[in-house]
Protein backbone atom coordinates (compact mmCIF):
# COMPACT_ATOMS: atom_id res chain seq x y z
CA UNK A 1 0.00 0.00 0.00
CA UNK A 2 1.35 3.42 -0.99
CA UNK A 3 1.87 5.43 2.21
CA UNK A 4 2.63 8.79 0.60
CA UNK A 5 0.25 11.23 -1.05
CA UNK A 6 1.77 13.29 -3.84
CA UNK A 7 0.52 16.00 -6.18
CA UNK A 8 2.42 17.42 -9.17
CA UNK A 9 4.35 20.65 -8.54
CA UNK A 10 2.77 21.05 -5.11
CA UNK A 11 4.43 21.81 -1.80
CA UNK A 12 3.14 21.12 1.69
CA UNK A 13 3.23 24.41 3.59
CA UNK A 14 2.09 25.51 7.04
CA UNK A 15 0.57 28.72 8.37
CA UNK A 16 1.08 29.53 12.05
CA UNK A 17 -1.42 30.76 14.61
CA UNK A 18 -1.41 34.19 16.26
CA UNK A 19 -3.32 33.37 19.44
CA UNK A 20 -1.52 30.02 19.61
CA UNK A 21 1.82 30.38 17.76
CA UNK A 22 2.51 26.65 18.08
CA UNK A 23 -0.34 25.88 15.67
CA UNK A 24 0.80 24.81 12.20
CA UNK A 25 -2.06 24.53 9.70
CA UNK A 26 -1.14 22.45 6.68
CA UNK A 27 -2.23 23.30 3.16
CA UNK A 28 -1.06 22.72 -0.38
CA UNK A 29 0.79 25.41 -2.35
CA UNK A 30 0.77 25.11 -6.14
CA UNK A 31 3.46 27.01 -8.00
CA UNK A 32 2.47 28.33 -11.43
CA UNK A 33 4.69 28.88 -14.44
CA UNK A 34 5.10 32.48 -15.67
CA UNK A 35 2.94 33.97 -18.41
CA UNK A 36 4.67 34.72 -21.72
CA UNK A 37 3.54 37.59 -23.95
CA UNK A 38 5.08 39.67 -26.73
CA UNK A 39 5.30 43.42 -27.11
CA UNK A 40 6.27 43.67 -30.73
CA UNK A 41 9.32 41.45 -31.01
CA UNK A 42 10.05 41.66 -27.29
CA UNK A 43 9.24 38.61 -25.17
CA UNK A 44 7.74 39.54 -21.79
CA UNK A 45 7.78 37.08 -18.87
CA UNK A 46 5.28 37.81 -16.07
CA UNK A 47 5.26 35.69 -12.88
CA UNK A 48 1.99 34.14 -11.75
CA UNK A 49 1.26 33.89 -8.02
CA UNK A 50 1.16 30.59 -6.19
CA UNK A 51 -2.25 29.22 -5.25
CA UNK A 52 -3.09 27.77 -1.83
CA UNK A 53 -5.44 24.78 -1.76
CA UNK A 54 -7.37 23.43 1.24
CA UNK A 55 -5.67 20.15 2.10
CA UNK A 56 -7.19 17.08 3.77
CA UNK A 57 -4.22 14.76 3.21
CA UNK A 58 -2.64 15.41 6.62
CA UNK A 59 0.88 14.09 7.27
CA UNK A 60 0.64 11.73 4.29
CA UNK A 61 1.68 14.58 1.96
CA UNK A 62 4.48 15.94 4.16
CA UNK A 63 7.83 14.45 3.04
CA UNK A 64 9.41 15.44 6.36
CA UNK A 65 7.08 13.27 8.48
CA UNK A 66 7.79 9.56 8.77
CA UNK A 67 4.71 7.49 8.01
CA UNK A 68 4.24 4.06 9.60
CA UNK A 69 0.68 2.74 9.44
CA UNK A 70 1.51 0.24 12.18
CA UNK A 71 2.25 3.10 14.60
CA UNK A 72 -0.37 5.56 13.39
CA UNK A 73 -0.17 9.27 12.64
CA UNK A 74 1.35 11.93 14.95
CA UNK A 75 -0.96 12.85 17.84
CA UNK A 76 -1.35 16.48 16.78
CA UNK A 77 -3.91 17.66 19.36
CA UNK A 78 -2.87 15.65 22.42
CA UNK A 79 -0.82 18.46 23.97
CA UNK A 80 -3.65 20.98 23.47
CA UNK A 81 -6.11 18.61 25.14
CA UNK A 82 -3.85 17.91 28.12
CA UNK A 83 -2.90 21.57 28.59
CA UNK A 84 -6.53 22.41 29.32
CA UNK A 85 -6.35 20.18 32.39
CA UNK A 86 -9.91 18.88 32.03
CA UNK A 87 -9.30 15.23 31.10
CA UNK A 88 -7.78 12.18 32.72
CA UNK A 89 -6.30 9.03 31.26
CA UNK A 90 -8.21 5.93 32.29
CA UNK A 91 -6.40 2.95 33.84
CA UNK A 92 -8.08 0.62 31.34
CA UNK A 93 -10.76 0.40 28.65
CA UNK A 94 -14.26 1.01 30.05
CA UNK A 95 -16.23 -1.02 27.51
CA UNK A 96 -16.88 -4.66 28.37
CA UNK A 97 -16.79 -5.58 24.68
CA UNK A 98 -13.59 -3.59 24.17
CA UNK A 99 -11.89 -5.53 26.97
CA UNK A 100 -13.13 -8.81 25.51
CA UNK A 101 -11.63 -8.03 22.10
CA UNK A 102 -8.38 -6.91 23.74
CA UNK A 103 -8.07 -10.19 25.64
CA UNK A 104 -8.88 -12.43 22.66
CA UNK A 105 -5.53 -13.86 21.56
CA UNK A 106 -6.95 -15.15 18.28
CA UNK A 107 -7.18 -11.53 17.10
CA UNK A 108 -3.51 -10.71 17.63
CA UNK A 109 -2.72 -10.95 13.92
CA UNK A 110 -5.40 -8.32 13.15
CA UNK A 111 -4.76 -5.96 16.01
CA UNK A 112 -3.33 -2.44 15.84
CA UNK A 113 -0.49 -2.79 18.35
CA UNK A 114 0.16 0.76 19.57
CA UNK A 115 -3.10 1.48 21.39
CA UNK A 116 -2.96 4.25 24.01
CA UNK A 117 -5.21 4.16 27.06
CA UNK A 118 -8.26 6.37 26.50
CA UNK A 119 -8.96 9.82 27.92
CA UNK A 120 -12.22 10.95 29.50
CA UNK A 121 -13.44 14.17 31.12
CA UNK A 122 -12.61 14.61 34.78
CA UNK A 123 -15.63 14.55 37.08
CA UNK A 124 -17.58 17.78 36.81
CA UNK A 125 -15.57 19.13 33.85
CA UNK A 126 -17.13 20.20 30.55
CA UNK A 127 -14.68 19.44 27.76
CA UNK A 128 -16.59 19.82 24.50
CA UNK A 129 -15.74 22.52 22.00
CA UNK A 130 -19.31 23.78 22.52
CA UNK A 131 -18.80 24.02 26.29
CA UNK A 132 -15.61 26.04 25.84
CA UNK A 133 -17.28 28.24 23.22
CA UNK A 134 -20.21 29.01 25.54
CA UNK A 135 -17.71 30.09 28.20
CA UNK A 136 -16.13 32.54 25.75
CA UNK A 137 -12.96 30.44 25.38
CA UNK A 138 -11.24 30.32 21.98
CA UNK A 139 -9.42 26.98 21.78
CA UNK A 140 -6.44 26.13 19.57
CA UNK A 141 -8.84 24.03 17.50
CA UNK A 142 -10.96 27.13 16.81
CA UNK A 143 -8.02 29.22 15.64
CA UNK A 144 -6.83 26.27 13.56
CA UNK A 145 -10.09 26.06 11.59
CA UNK A 146 -10.22 29.84 11.12
CA UNK A 147 -6.77 29.76 9.50
CA UNK A 148 -7.73 26.71 7.48
CA UNK A 149 -10.94 28.25 6.13
CA UNK A 150 -9.20 31.49 5.09
CA UNK A 151 -5.98 29.95 3.73
CA UNK A 152 -3.95 32.88 2.36
CA UNK A 153 -6.78 35.44 2.04
CA UNK A 154 -4.75 37.91 4.12
CA UNK A 155 -1.79 37.66 1.74
CA UNK A 156 -4.12 38.24 -1.22
CA UNK A 157 -5.90 41.18 0.43
CA UNK A 158 -9.26 39.38 0.46
CA UNK A 159 -11.64 40.41 3.23
CA UNK A 160 -12.99 37.59 5.37
CA UNK A 161 -15.50 37.32 8.18
CA UNK A 162 -13.93 34.14 9.55
CA UNK A 163 -11.89 34.84 12.69
CA UNK A 164 -11.23 32.60 15.70
CA UNK A 165 -13.87 34.60 17.59
CA UNK A 166 -16.39 34.09 14.77
CA UNK A 167 -15.71 30.35 14.91
CA UNK A 168 -16.30 30.39 18.67
CA UNK A 169 -19.61 32.22 18.27
CA UNK A 170 -20.88 29.83 15.59
CA UNK A 171 -20.07 26.80 17.76
CA UNK A 172 -21.59 28.37 20.88
CA UNK A 173 -24.84 29.09 19.03
CA UNK A 174 -24.99 25.57 17.56
CA UNK A 175 -24.66 26.80 13.98
CA UNK A 176 -21.37 24.95 13.50
CA UNK A 177 -19.77 21.71 14.66
CA UNK A 178 -16.06 21.10 15.24
CA UNK A 179 -15.89 17.29 15.58
CA UNK A 180 -12.89 16.49 17.76
CA UNK A 181 -12.99 13.45 20.06
CA UNK A 182 -10.25 13.74 22.69
CA UNK A 183 -9.27 10.15 21.77
CA UNK A 184 -8.63 11.04 18.13
CA UNK A 185 -5.79 13.54 18.53
CA UNK A 186 -4.46 12.55 15.10
CA UNK A 187 -7.32 14.44 13.42
CA UNK A 188 -6.69 17.93 12.08
CA UNK A 189 -9.46 20.30 13.25
CA UNK A 190 -12.13 21.20 10.69
CA UNK A 191 -15.55 22.82 10.94
CA UNK A 192 -19.01 22.05 9.61
CA UNK A 193 -21.41 24.99 9.31
CA UNK A 194 -23.36 26.96 6.73
CA UNK A 195 -21.10 30.03 7.15
CA UNK A 196 -17.99 28.04 6.25
CA UNK A 197 -16.75 26.04 3.28
CA UNK A 198 -19.17 23.27 2.29
CA UNK A 199 -17.65 19.97 3.43
CA UNK A 200 -18.01 16.47 2.04
CA UNK A 201 -18.15 13.13 3.79
CA UNK A 202 -16.91 9.82 2.42
CA UNK A 203 -18.49 6.50 3.39
CA UNK A 204 -16.31 3.40 3.52
CA UNK A 205 -16.56 0.12 5.40
CA UNK A 206 -16.57 -3.62 4.92
CA UNK A 207 -19.59 -5.87 4.51
CA UNK A 208 -20.27 -9.50 5.34
CA UNK A 209 -19.08 -10.50 1.87
CA UNK A 210 -16.33 -8.11 0.80
CA UNK A 211 -13.24 -6.09 1.79
CA UNK A 212 -10.40 -6.40 4.32
CA UNK A 213 -8.81 -4.12 6.93
CA UNK A 214 -6.01 -3.18 4.52
CA UNK A 215 -8.51 -2.26 1.81
CA UNK A 216 -10.51 -0.04 4.16
CA UNK A 217 -7.40 1.78 5.43
CA UNK A 218 -6.35 2.31 1.81
CA UNK A 219 -9.81 3.70 0.97
CA UNK A 220 -9.53 6.08 3.93
CA UNK A 221 -6.17 7.39 2.70
CA UNK A 222 -7.55 7.64 -0.83
CA UNK A 223 -10.49 9.72 0.39
CA UNK A 224 -8.12 12.08 2.23
CA UNK A 225 -6.01 12.46 -0.90
CA UNK A 226 -8.87 13.58 -3.10
CA UNK A 227 -10.47 15.92 -0.57
CA UNK A 228 -12.82 14.04 1.75
CA UNK A 229 -13.35 16.26 4.81
CA UNK A 230 -14.76 13.54 7.07
CA UNK A 231 -14.94 9.77 6.87
CA UNK A 232 -17.67 7.41 7.99
CA UNK A 233 -16.80 3.79 8.72
CA UNK A 234 -20.01 1.89 7.98
CA UNK A 235 -18.53 -1.58 8.40
CA UNK A 236 -21.09 -4.35 8.89
CA UNK A 237 -18.85 -7.38 8.38
CA UNK A 238 -16.29 -9.14 10.54
CA UNK A 239 -13.80 -7.51 12.92
CA UNK A 240 -15.54 -4.13 13.02
CA UNK A 241 -13.68 -3.14 16.21
CA UNK A 242 -10.23 -3.87 14.80
CA UNK A 243 -10.98 -2.30 11.41
CA UNK A 244 -12.10 0.91 13.09
CA UNK A 245 -8.96 1.11 15.26
CA UNK A 246 -6.69 0.90 12.21
CA UNK A 247 -8.70 3.55 10.39
CA UNK A 248 -8.84 6.03 13.29
CA UNK A 249 -5.15 5.76 14.15
CA UNK A 250 -4.26 6.54 10.53
CA UNK A 251 -6.91 9.12 9.70
CA UNK A 252 -6.19 12.89 9.68
CA UNK A 253 -9.89 13.77 9.30
CA UNK A 254 -12.81 13.24 11.72
CA UNK A 255 -14.29 9.74 11.69
CA UNK A 256 -17.98 8.97 12.13
CA UNK A 257 -19.89 5.71 12.61
CA UNK A 258 -23.42 4.38 13.00
CA UNK A 259 -23.14 2.49 16.33
CA UNK A 260 -26.37 0.56 15.82
CA UNK A 261 -24.65 -1.40 13.02
CA UNK A 262 -22.07 -2.86 15.37
CA UNK A 263 -24.66 -3.38 18.09
CA UNK A 264 -26.74 -5.43 15.64
CA UNK A 265 -23.68 -7.47 14.67
CA UNK A 266 -23.17 -8.29 18.36
CA UNK A 267 -26.64 -9.91 18.52
CA UNK A 268 -26.11 -11.79 15.25
CA UNK A 269 -28.49 -9.60 13.29
CA UNK A 270 -31.51 -10.18 15.54
CA UNK A 271 -33.12 -6.76 15.85
CA UNK A 272 -35.44 -7.86 18.65
CA UNK A 273 -32.41 -8.71 20.84
CA UNK A 274 -31.01 -5.17 20.82
CA UNK A 275 -30.98 -3.50 24.25
CA UNK A 276 -30.03 -0.13 25.70
CA UNK A 277 -27.29 -1.77 27.81
CA UNK A 278 -25.67 -3.31 24.72
CA UNK A 279 -25.93 -0.07 22.78
CA UNK A 280 -24.51 1.94 25.68
CA UNK A 281 -21.46 -0.31 25.86
CA UNK A 282 -21.01 0.08 22.10
CA UNK A 283 -21.08 3.86 22.43
CA UNK A 284 -18.42 3.82 25.14
CA UNK A 285 -16.30 1.36 23.15
CA UNK A 286 -16.31 3.65 20.12
CA UNK A 287 -15.89 6.87 22.14
CA UNK A 288 -12.74 5.45 23.68
CA UNK A 289 -11.39 4.37 20.30
CA UNK A 290 -11.75 7.94 19.05
CA UNK A 291 -14.87 8.16 16.88
CA UNK A 292 -15.63 11.88 16.38
CA UNK A 293 -19.34 11.72 15.61
CA UNK A 294 -22.15 9.20 15.74
CA UNK A 295 -25.17 8.90 13.49
CA UNK A 296 -27.99 8.10 15.90
CA UNK A 297 -31.52 7.49 14.62
CA UNK A 298 -33.26 8.79 17.73
CA UNK A 299 -35.86 10.63 15.65
CA UNK A 300 -37.73 7.36 14.96
CA UNK A 301 -40.85 7.43 17.14
CA UNK A 302 -43.23 4.52 17.74
CA UNK A 303 -46.24 6.56 16.64
CA UNK A 304 -44.58 7.72 13.39
CA UNK A 305 -43.34 4.40 11.97
CA UNK A 306 -46.66 3.69 10.23
CA UNK A 307 -46.37 6.88 8.17
CA UNK A 308 -43.85 5.18 5.88
CA UNK A 309 -46.40 2.53 4.87
CA UNK A 310 -47.88 4.92 2.30
CA UNK A 311 -44.60 5.20 0.45
CA UNK A 312 -43.50 3.73 -2.84
CA UNK A 313 -40.18 2.60 -1.31
CA UNK A 314 -40.92 2.41 2.41
CA UNK A 315 -37.97 2.88 4.80
CA UNK A 316 -34.60 2.86 3.03
CA UNK A 317 -32.28 3.85 5.88
CA UNK A 318 -30.55 0.84 7.45
CA UNK A 319 -30.58 2.46 10.88
CA UNK A 320 -34.13 3.63 10.38
CA UNK A 321 -35.39 0.19 9.40
CA UNK A 322 -33.60 -1.42 12.36
CA UNK A 323 -35.12 0.95 14.90
CA UNK A 324 -38.56 0.88 13.27
CA UNK A 325 -38.63 -2.91 13.46
CA UNK A 326 -37.48 -2.77 17.11
CA UNK A 327 -40.31 -0.36 17.98
CA UNK A 328 -42.91 -2.57 16.32
CA UNK A 329 -41.61 -5.85 17.78
CA UNK A 330 -41.55 -4.44 21.32
CA UNK A 331 -44.51 -2.08 20.79
CA UNK A 332 -42.75 0.73 22.64
CA UNK A 333 -40.70 3.86 22.12
CA UNK A 334 -37.19 3.47 20.72
CA UNK A 335 -34.47 3.10 23.37
CA UNK A 336 -32.48 5.68 21.41
CA UNK A 337 -35.21 8.25 22.01
CA UNK A 338 -35.92 7.19 25.60
CA UNK A 339 -32.23 7.31 26.54
CA UNK A 340 -31.19 10.30 24.43
CA UNK A 341 -30.17 12.34 27.48
CA UNK A 342 -28.07 9.40 28.70
CA UNK A 343 -26.48 9.18 25.25
CA UNK A 344 -25.56 12.87 25.40
CA UNK A 345 -24.06 12.44 28.88
CA UNK A 346 -21.73 9.77 27.45
CA UNK A 347 -20.80 11.79 24.36
CA UNK A 348 -20.04 14.89 26.43
CA UNK A 349 -17.33 13.03 28.35
CA UNK A 350 -15.30 12.52 25.15
CA UNK A 351 -16.47 15.45 22.97
CA UNK A 352 -18.21 13.26 20.44
CA UNK A 353 -20.75 15.05 18.24
CA UNK A 354 -24.15 13.59 17.41
CA UNK A 355 -25.41 13.44 13.85
CA UNK A 356 -29.16 12.96 14.14
CA UNK A 357 -29.86 10.28 11.54
CA UNK A 358 -32.76 10.61 9.12
CA UNK A 359 -34.17 7.11 9.45
CA UNK A 360 -37.29 8.11 7.51
CA UNK A 361 -35.53 9.84 4.62
CA UNK A 362 -37.21 9.33 1.22
CA UNK A 363 -35.77 6.55 -0.94
CA UNK A 364 -37.42 7.77 -4.13
CA UNK A 365 -38.37 11.13 -5.57
CA UNK A 366 -41.99 9.97 -5.30
CA UNK A 367 -41.68 9.88 -1.50
CA UNK A 368 -39.86 13.21 -1.05
CA UNK A 369 -41.13 15.75 1.48
CA UNK A 370 -43.81 13.43 2.80
CA UNK A 371 -45.42 13.26 6.23
CA UNK A 372 -43.02 10.60 7.53
CA UNK A 373 -39.90 12.57 6.59
CA UNK A 374 -41.08 15.81 8.16
CA UNK A 375 -42.49 14.16 11.29
CA UNK A 376 -39.00 12.85 12.01
CA UNK A 377 -37.51 16.29 11.29
CA UNK A 378 -39.78 17.76 13.98
CA UNK A 379 -38.40 15.26 16.51
CA UNK A 380 -34.85 16.10 15.44
CA UNK A 381 -35.56 19.73 16.29
CA UNK A 382 -36.47 18.68 19.83
CA UNK A 383 -33.41 16.43 20.16
CA UNK A 384 -30.88 18.98 18.95
CA UNK A 385 -31.92 21.35 21.74
CA UNK A 386 -31.54 18.55 24.28
CA UNK A 387 -28.04 17.83 22.95
CA UNK A 388 -27.05 21.50 23.23
CA UNK A 389 -28.28 21.59 26.82
CA UNK A 390 -25.68 18.88 27.53
CA UNK A 391 -23.00 20.85 25.59
CA UNK A 392 -22.96 18.17 22.89
CA UNK A 393 -22.35 19.40 19.36
CA UNK A 394 -25.07 18.28 16.96
CA UNK A 395 -26.01 18.33 13.31
CA UNK A 396 -28.98 17.08 11.32
CA UNK A 397 -28.97 14.48 8.55
CA UNK A 398 -31.20 14.97 5.52
CA UNK A 399 -32.34 13.26 2.32
CA UNK A 400 -32.04 11.37 0.15
CA UNK A 401 -34.09 11.44 -3.05
CA UNK A 402 -35.67 14.85 -3.75
CA UNK A 403 -36.64 16.36 -7.12
CA UNK A 404 -35.19 19.80 -7.74
CA UNK A 405 -38.39 21.76 -7.16
CA UNK A 406 -38.70 20.30 -3.65
CA UNK A 407 -35.12 20.92 -2.47
CA UNK A 408 -35.63 24.45 -1.15
CA UNK A 409 -38.46 23.34 1.15
CA UNK A 410 -36.09 20.82 2.79
CA UNK A 411 -33.56 23.51 3.62
CA UNK A 412 -36.12 26.03 4.84
CA UNK A 413 -37.92 23.50 7.05
CA UNK A 414 -34.64 22.26 8.51
CA UNK A 415 -33.56 25.79 9.44
CA UNK A 416 -36.94 26.50 11.02
CA UNK A 417 -37.46 23.23 12.89
CA UNK A 418 -33.84 22.54 13.88
CA UNK A 419 -32.81 26.01 15.04
CA UNK A 420 -30.01 26.58 12.49
CA UNK A 421 -28.10 23.42 13.41
CA UNK A 422 -25.84 22.33 10.51
CA UNK A 423 -27.57 20.25 7.82
CA UNK A 424 -25.83 17.16 6.37
CA UNK A 425 -27.46 15.60 3.31
CA UNK A 426 -27.00 12.51 1.16
CA UNK A 427 -27.15 14.24 -2.19
CA UNK A 428 -30.06 14.58 -2.69
CA UNK A 429 -30.59 12.52 -5.83
CA UNK A 430 -32.86 14.48 -8.16
CA UNK A 431 -33.98 11.55 -10.30
CA UNK A 432 -34.21 7.77 -9.85
CA UNK A 433 -33.51 6.54 -13.39
CA UNK A 434 -29.71 6.45 -13.48
CA UNK A 435 -28.22 3.42 -11.65
CA UNK A 436 -24.48 3.50 -12.29
CA UNK A 437 -24.56 7.30 -12.53
CA UNK A 438 -26.05 8.24 -9.18
CA UNK A 439 -22.91 10.20 -8.28
CA UNK A 440 -24.13 12.62 -10.96
CA UNK A 441 -27.85 12.59 -10.13
CA UNK A 442 -26.98 13.30 -6.51
CA UNK A 443 -24.30 15.93 -7.18
CA UNK A 444 -26.89 18.01 -9.03
CA UNK A 445 -29.02 18.13 -5.89
CA UNK A 446 -25.98 18.46 -3.62
CA UNK A 447 -24.76 21.61 -5.38
CA UNK A 448 -28.20 23.17 -5.07
CA UNK A 449 -28.80 22.34 -1.42
CA UNK A 450 -25.22 23.34 -0.57
CA UNK A 451 -25.85 26.76 -2.11
CA UNK A 452 -29.05 27.05 -0.08
CA UNK A 453 -27.20 26.39 3.19
CA UNK A 454 -26.39 22.72 3.73
CA UNK A 455 -23.10 22.48 5.61
CA UNK A 456 -21.90 19.00 4.62
CA UNK A 457 -22.66 16.71 1.70
CA UNK A 458 -22.39 12.94 1.95
CA UNK A 459 -20.87 11.63 -1.24
CA UNK A 460 -22.47 9.09 -3.53
CA UNK A 461 -20.41 6.79 -5.75
CA UNK A 462 -21.29 5.31 -9.16
CA UNK A 463 -22.04 2.04 -7.37
CA UNK A 464 -24.80 3.51 -5.16
CA UNK A 465 -27.73 1.04 -4.98
CA UNK A 466 -25.60 -1.55 -6.80
CA UNK A 467 -22.49 -2.68 -4.90
CA UNK A 468 -19.86 -1.84 -2.27
CA UNK A 469 -17.57 0.88 -3.69
CA UNK A 470 -13.92 0.12 -4.31
CA UNK A 471 -10.95 2.46 -4.29
CA UNK A 472 -11.64 3.92 -7.75
CA UNK A 473 -15.30 4.48 -6.88
CA UNK A 474 -14.20 6.43 -3.80
CA UNK A 475 -12.07 8.67 -6.02
CA UNK A 476 -14.91 9.35 -8.46
CA UNK A 477 -17.38 9.98 -5.64
CA UNK A 478 -15.10 12.38 -3.78
CA UNK A 479 -14.14 14.38 -6.89
CA UNK A 480 -17.77 14.60 -7.99
CA UNK A 481 -18.77 15.96 -4.59
CA UNK A 482 -15.82 18.35 -4.43
CA UNK A 483 -17.26 19.85 -7.61
CA UNK A 484 -20.69 20.20 -6.00
CA UNK A 485 -19.28 21.66 -2.77
CA UNK A 486 -17.02 24.13 -4.56
CA UNK A 487 -19.86 25.22 -6.84
CA UNK A 488 -21.88 25.96 -3.70
CA UNK A 489 -18.96 27.88 -2.15
CA UNK A 490 -18.73 30.06 -5.26
CA UNK A 491 -22.46 30.75 -5.18
CA UNK A 492 -22.29 31.59 -1.45
CA UNK A 493 -19.35 33.94 -1.99
CA UNK A 494 -17.02 32.22 0.46
CA UNK A 495 -13.86 34.32 0.95
CA UNK A 496 -11.22 33.26 -1.55
CA UNK A 497 -13.36 30.62 -3.27
CA UNK A 498 -12.90 32.29 -6.67
CA UNK A 499 -9.08 32.40 -6.53
CA UNK A 500 -8.46 28.89 -7.83
CA UNK A 501 -11.07 29.23 -10.60
CA UNK A 502 -9.53 32.49 -11.81
CA UNK A 503 -6.04 31.00 -11.77
CA UNK A 504 -7.09 27.96 -13.78
CA UNK A 505 -9.11 30.06 -16.24
CA UNK A 506 -6.12 32.34 -16.83
CA UNK A 507 -3.89 29.30 -17.34
CA UNK A 508 -6.41 27.89 -19.84
CA UNK A 509 -6.54 31.17 -21.77
CA UNK A 510 -2.74 31.29 -21.93
CA UNK A 511 -2.39 27.58 -22.81
CA UNK A 512 -0.34 26.89 -19.70
CA UNK A 513 -1.26 23.22 -19.72
CA UNK A 514 0.73 22.15 -16.66
CA UNK A 515 -0.94 24.80 -14.51
CA UNK A 516 -4.34 23.66 -15.75
CA UNK A 517 -3.56 20.13 -14.61
CA UNK A 518 -1.98 21.13 -11.31
CA UNK A 519 -4.83 23.43 -10.27
CA UNK A 520 -7.55 20.92 -11.13
CA UNK A 521 -9.36 18.71 -8.62
CA UNK A 522 -7.88 15.61 -10.27
CA UNK A 523 -4.54 16.48 -11.92
CA UNK A 524 -3.85 12.87 -12.86
CA UNK A 525 -7.13 12.43 -14.72
CA UNK A 526 -6.83 15.77 -16.51
CA UNK A 527 -3.31 14.96 -17.70
CA UNK A 528 -4.24 11.46 -18.83
CA UNK A 529 -7.03 12.79 -21.06
CA UNK A 530 -4.74 15.47 -22.48
CA UNK A 531 -1.94 12.98 -23.07
CA UNK A 532 -4.30 10.58 -24.82
CA UNK A 533 -4.86 13.32 -27.41
CA UNK A 534 -1.30 12.68 -28.63
CA UNK A 535 -0.29 16.28 -29.01
CA UNK A 536 2.38 18.47 -27.46
CA UNK A 537 1.97 21.58 -25.32
CA UNK A 538 0.64 23.60 -28.26
CA UNK A 539 -1.87 26.43 -28.25
CA UNK A 540 -4.86 24.19 -28.91
CA UNK A 541 -6.23 20.78 -27.97
CA UNK A 542 -7.72 17.99 -30.07
CA UNK A 543 -11.25 19.21 -29.31
CA UNK A 544 -10.88 22.19 -31.68
CA UNK A 545 -7.55 21.80 -33.43
CA UNK A 546 -5.36 24.74 -34.49
CA UNK A 547 -7.89 26.56 -36.67
CA UNK A 548 -11.02 26.44 -34.51
CA UNK A 549 -9.64 27.23 -31.05
CA UNK A 550 -11.76 30.15 -29.82
CA UNK A 551 -9.30 31.16 -27.10
CA UNK A 552 -6.42 31.17 -29.58
CA UNK A 553 -8.41 33.33 -32.00
CA UNK A 554 -9.42 35.63 -29.14
CA UNK A 555 -5.79 36.11 -28.13
CA UNK A 556 -4.81 36.86 -31.73
CA UNK A 557 -7.62 39.40 -31.92
CA UNK A 558 -6.47 41.10 -28.72
CA UNK A 559 -2.89 41.19 -30.04
CA UNK A 560 -4.05 42.78 -33.31
CA UNK A 561 -6.05 45.44 -31.49
CA UNK A 562 -3.04 46.32 -29.32
CA UNK A 563 -0.87 46.76 -32.41
CA UNK A 564 -3.42 49.20 -33.86
Swiss-Prot record:
Binds 1 [4Fe-4S] cluster per subunit. The cluster is coordinated with 3 cysteines and an exchangeable S-adenosyl-L-methionine. It comes from Bacteroides fragilis (strain ATCC 25285 / DSM 2151 / CCUG 4856 / JCM 11019 / LMG 10263 / NCTC 9343 / Onslow / VPI 2553 / EN-2). Keywords: 4Fe-4S, Iron, Iron-sulfur, Lyase, Metal-binding, S-adenosyl-L-methionine, Thiamine biosynthesis, Zinc. Pathway: Cofactor biosynthesis; thiamine diphosphate biosynthesis. One of its GO terms (cellular component) is cytosol. [4Fe-4S] cluster binds at residues 541, 544, 549. It catalyses: 5-amino-1-(5-phospho-beta-D-ribosyl)imidazole + S-adenosyl-L-methionine = 4-amino-2-methyl-5-(phosphooxymethyl)pyrimidine + CO + 5'-deoxyadenosine + formate + L-methionine + 3 H(+). Belongs to the ThiC family. Catalyzes the synthesis of the hydroxymethylpyrimidine phosphate (HMP-P) moiety of thiamine from aminoimidazole ribotide (AIR) in a radical S-adenosyl-L-methionine (SAM)-dependent reaction. Substrate binds at residues 203, 232, 261, 297, 317-319, 358-361, 397, 424. NCBIfam families: PRK09284.1, PRK13352.1, thiC. Zn(2+) binds at residues 401, 465. GO terms for molecular function: 4 iron, 4 sulfur cluster binding; carbon-carbon lyase activity; zinc ion binding. Its cofactor is [4Fe-4S] cluster. One of its GO terms (biological process) is thiamine biosynthetic process. This is Phosphomethylpyrimidine synthase. Its EC number is 4.1.99.17. InterPro entries: ThiC (IPR037509), ThiC-associated_dom (IPR025747), ThiC/Bza_core_dom (IPR038521), ThiC/BzaA/B (IPR002817). It comes from the Bacteria.
